[in-house]
Amino acid sequence: MVELYQKLLGMRRIKRKISWRVSAKPVSEEDLNRDLLASKLLKAGDVLMVHSSLSSIGNVLGGPEAVCRVFQRVLTESGTLLMPTYHQPEPILKMIKKGSLVDLRTAESTMGKLTETFRTIPGVKRSSHPFSSVSAWGRYSKEMTSGHENSPYICGPGSPFAQLIERSAKYMGIGIDIRVIALYHVLEENWSDFPLRVHYPKPFNVRYIDPSGNRVERQLIILDPAVAKTRIDREVEGAWIRKWLTNYMRTKGILHGFKVGQANSWIVGSQSFYDEMKSLAIRGITIYTTEREFNTIKKEG
């Protein structure tokens, strides 16, 4: 009964979303291009990671293909565009246990229609990770998708995420909040003095087919779900830290808000965001900090 209710509720939400997109004012490529340029936050040659909710932009003429073209047009081939082409880890791990292999040449992104469309564009390259791959287009696409297989950590040294820091990339969200920023985990997995243990203590073996068609077997270290109960991406438990951190980064001049079509959007500089998160962690404030812990830190500090 509960499952049926959840299914019906999900169908109603989808119908409302489709109805809103159809009735919304059409958004053209020129509109999107104008929005990006008017923000004065992007330029040719930038390295940019984009997370998105396509439906939040509105009724985009040309669909996700048009959105991809606009970003390519703004960044030009001298820039680099990246998008997450993740899968949920649980189904992938179940597949592996059953002896099946995820094939990164064909496996679809579960991060939305825009990311899946981007993945299939000619010239786009994909990193070698069974459930946290990144796809990239442009000048550094090969370099930024190479090396993901060399670290057991998702955001470890050489990963596309760590390279965002090294290349002074910009990080953008369209119609979504800051829970999606992977730079949090770059800090956890590259700074030895991070104040919490957030990973399983032991690695586990995974097998998959990489974007070149090679069978890969290697070890991975993943985040511990038990520790993640209060993390920033948790809908209820993480709501307070999302709100506080958004305001904090905006006040610091690190997070900049603007519109893309109908979507409330934001952009941060990867290096400045990383540095500020490190400064907060030194004070004991992380994406896992509860509101009670935060208030205690404030009283003591």
Model-derived segments and spans:
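Short, flexible loop segments at boundaries between secondary-structure elements
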Residues: F194-A226
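N-terminal active-site beta-alpha-beta segment that forms phosphate/nucleotide-binding
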Residues: L32-R34, L41-I96
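A conditional alpha-helix N-cap/helix-loop micro-motif detector
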Residues: K25-E30, P64, Y153-I154
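Secondary-structure boundary elements
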Residues: K40-G45, R73-T80, I121-K125, Q163-K170
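Membrane-proximal basic amphipathic "stem/tether" segments
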Residues: M1-A24
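Acidic/aromatic/glycine-rich contiguous surface patches that form carbohydrate-binding/processing clefts
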Residues: E217-G301
